[in-house]
Amino acid sequence: MLPVVALVGRPNVGKSTLFNRLTRTRDALVADFPGLTRDRKYGQANYDGYQFIVIDTGGIHGDEEGIDEEMAKQSLLAVDEADVVLFMVDARDGVTVGDQAIADHLRKQNKKVYLVCNKIDGIDAHSAMADFYSLSLGELYGIAAAHGRGVEQLLEICFKPIAEEYPDVIVPKDVASEELEHDEIDYDKLPLKLAIVGRPNVGKSTLINRILGEERVVVYDMPGTTRDSVYIPMQRNEREYVLIDTAGVRRRGRIGEAIEKFSVVKTLQAIEDANVVLIVVDARETISDQDLNLIGFALNAGRSIVIAVNKWDGLQNDHKEEIKRELDRRLGFVDFARLHFISALHGTGVGHLFESVEEAYASATQRISTSKLTKIMEMAQEEHQPPLVSGRRVKLKYAHAGGYNPPRIIIHGNQVKDLPGAYQRYLINYFRKSLGVMGTPIKVEFREPVNPYEGKKNQLTLSQQRKRRRLMKFLKKKK
């Protein structure tokens, strides 16, 4: 489970600036969920190799009588989802009525709250911050989010309690990858964690109940560490699975479509915890921007994906063809993912989903030798040579595996970091086709040889120093 950090405060205190600074990594999800989360923005961020979800709650107003209860329930829902709350105030404005109202609300919550004074650049920070001790929220932390001043120190302090609470969950990525490269992991013997995600009322509940009903095995609900998600162990064809159900707890017989509460945090955490993500979309509504956001997050997280288009039964043939054309147009960036047309209610096509799930997992965890990867790279070069960069041909020397789940291929060569994006995509697609990889993203990294003398000054030998002194004396005499 990824820990959650919520940014709370009045409008224009710098929450969005800090949000953008924290989510500057390539893995960041910079997408809004309009209509589902109000003003809240959710992003994936990275600090010192640690992954976490950050929420920008949007501006919260207050008055002399405090925050309106109903508005607080809506605007401060992120506080309930958070492990850590960063309460941001504007050091230049001093304490306002809105700050006091928000502080009163936060003191009632059983959450770790850090009071962050933003915009301390160019002013006497100590005197400006002193006023905020009246909010009675403990120590103050001064930052300038626009310039990054104090942000790293703040994160270091924030992550101490999180690391203590989740020592087995939050592991720096470089450590995890080293363990993955050196330990022989038998993925076939591990339970396959399958997250079923999607927008509200696309049929997730019905699909999960259909899967569990078809298996006719004794299952039980095992509450996971992810908020409100349910981890359901099951077995299919002698294969162990764990279904990660983000739709909440329900009785098996209750398969009617109720209005589901959509929790973005719950969904993103389920994606991070899964091996394969089954994304359910509604055929009658076609693909939406929110569906694309979920797919994009799964890809950025390196998860294998399978897409299920639900409620396919009962549609006219011409309508089905129209939907297929729309899916082809909007899902071109994930053409490697298997697409299934199903009816969770009637069971049509549900059994075939697991064939694609197992295929995607096998593709993500297959071991590939250095010789095979290098051979494929050489074949790709023979068909299409790398382009010229500054008049010189880019040289690709060899390739090797850098990790699994998802597959990570590292290519060594000269000037490889200058390869244009089009050629990088060509290599990824060539590797995918040659390896027969389906359902999982492939990550390719490029590395150049390190020059050990780069940035170092040459030391003169004794004879060179004497020669230099003689030359300097000669030049002085000429003047």
Curated annotation (Swiss-Prot):
GTP 1 binds at residues 9-16, 56-60, 118-121. One of its GO terms (molecular function) is GTP binding. Residues 3-166, 192-365 form the EngA-type G domain. GO terms for biological process: ribosome biogenesis. CDD domains: EngA1, EngA2. Residues 366-450 form the KH-like domain. Disulfide bonds: none annotated. SUPFAM superfamilies: P-loop containing nucleoside triphosphate hydrolases. GTP 2 binds at residues 198-205, 245-249, 310-313. It comes from the Bacteria. Pfam families: KH_dom-like, MMR_HSR1. SMART domains: AAA. Associates with the 50S ribosomal subunit. PANTHER family: GTPASE DER (PTHR43834:SF6). NCBIfam families: GTPase_EngA, small_GTP. HAMAP family: GTPase_Der. GTPase that plays an essential role in the late steps of ribosome biogenesis. This is GTPase Der. It comes from Idiomarina loihiensis (strain ATCC BAA-735 / DSM 15497 / L2-TR). The gene is der.
